[in-house]
C-alpha cells in the first residue's frame, strides 16, 4: 500500500497536468502579442489620458570621461525648450505617454523629439505620492548636425522619480568617444 500511494500520485499528476498546461508561445506569436499590447497601450493613452503633461528640459550633461575637454567646454548643457504630452497610469502604477518636445541641443541648435514612453512604476508609500520608474522611450528626433534634420528613430532608457504630479525624468543617450554619452533630464508636470 505504501508503494501504491506514491505511484498513484505520479500517475494522477501525469494525467491531470497536461489538462492545465498552456500552449507554448514562440517567436512570431510572442512578437505579435507584444506588438498588440504596445499598440493597444498607445491607443488607450491617446484616447483616454489621465493627465496632460508639460515637459521642461533642464540638463544635457556630457560624460566627461568620454569627451575631449575642448569639446565639452563649447557644448550647451542647458537645453532650453519645452514640450507637451498626454499620459496615464494603469492599476499597477505603470506609466504610458505620448509626447513632443523641442529643445536646444549640445550645439545650441533646435532639436525636436516626439514619441511614446513607458515605465514600470514602484510606489514608495501607501498614499502613492512617491514613485520611481524604469522604462523606455521610442520615437523620432532630428538634428541640425545630422544631414540637416533628417528624421532619426530612437529607443532610449527612461528613469524617473516623482512626487504627486511633479516628476523628474532622465534618459542616457549612448555613443562613442566625443559623440553621444549624454545624460538628458527634464521636469514633467502633470495637469
UniProtKB/Swiss-Prot annotation:
The active site is at 62, 105, 106. It comes from Enterobacter cloacae. It is found in: Cell outer membrane. NCBIfam families: PRK11045.1. InterPro entries: LipidA_acyl_PagP (IPR009746), OMP/PagP_b-brl (IPR011250). Its main location: membrane. This is Lipid A acyltransferase PagP. One of its GO terms (cellular component) is cell outer membrane. One of its GO terms (biological process) is lipid A biosynthetic process. The gene is pagP. One of its GO terms (molecular function) is acyltransferase activity. The record marks 71 as: Role in lipopolysaccharide recognition. SUPFAM superfamilies: OMPA-like. Keywords: Acyltransferase, Cell outer membrane, Membrane, Signal, Transferase. The record marks 177 as: Role in the phospholipid gating. Belongs to the lipid A palmitoyltransferase family. Pfam families: PagP. It catalyses: a lipid A + a 1,2-diacyl-sn-glycero-3-phosphocholine = a hepta-acyl lipid A + a 2-acyl-sn-glycero-3-phosphocholine; a lipid IVA + a 1,2-diacyl-sn-glycero-3-phosphocholine = a lipid IVB + a 2-acyl-sn-glycero-3-phosphocholine; a lipid IIA + a 1,2-diacyl-sn-glycero-3-phosphocholine = a lipid IIB + a 2-acyl-sn-glycero-3-phosphocholine. The keyword Methyltransferase does not apply. Homodimer. Residues 1-21 form the signal peptide. Its EC number is 2.3.1.251. Transfers a fatty acid residue from the sn-1 position of a phospholipid to the N-linked hydroxyfatty acid chain on the proximal unit of lipid A or its precursors.
Amino acid at each position: 500500500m505504501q508503494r501504491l500511494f506514491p505511484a498513484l500520485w505520479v500517475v494522477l499528476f501525469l494525467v491531470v497536468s497536461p489538462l492545465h498546461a498552456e500552449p507554448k508561445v514562440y517567436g512570431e506569436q510572442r512578437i505579435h502579442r507584444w506588438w498588440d499590447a504596445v499598440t493597444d497601450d498607445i491607443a488607450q493613452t491617446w484616447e483616454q489620458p489621465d493627465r496632460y503633461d508639460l515637459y521642461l528640459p533642464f540638463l544635457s550633461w556630457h560624460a566627461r570621461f568620454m569627451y575631449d575637454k575642448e569639446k565639452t567646454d563649447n557644448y550647451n548643457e542647458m537645453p532650453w525648450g519645452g514640450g507637451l504630452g498626454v499620459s496615464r497610469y494603469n492599476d499597477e502604477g505603470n506609466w504610458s505617454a505620448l509626447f513632443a518636445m523641442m529643445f536646444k541641443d549640445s550645439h545650441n541648435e533646435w532639436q525636436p523629439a516626439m514619441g511614446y514612453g513607458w515605465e514600470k512604476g514602484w510606489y514608495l508609500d501607501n498614499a502613492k505620492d512617491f514613485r520611481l520608474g524604469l522604462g523606455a522611450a521610442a520615437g523620432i528626433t532630428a538634428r541640425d548636425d545630422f544631414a540637416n534634420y533628417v528624421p532619426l528613430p530612437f529607443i532610449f532608457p527612461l528613469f524617473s522619480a516623482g512626487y504627486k504630479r511633479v516628476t523628474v525624468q532622465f534618459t542616457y543617450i549612448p555613443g562613442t568617444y566625443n559623440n553621444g554619452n549624454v545624460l538628458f533630464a527634464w521636469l514633467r508636470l502633470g495637469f
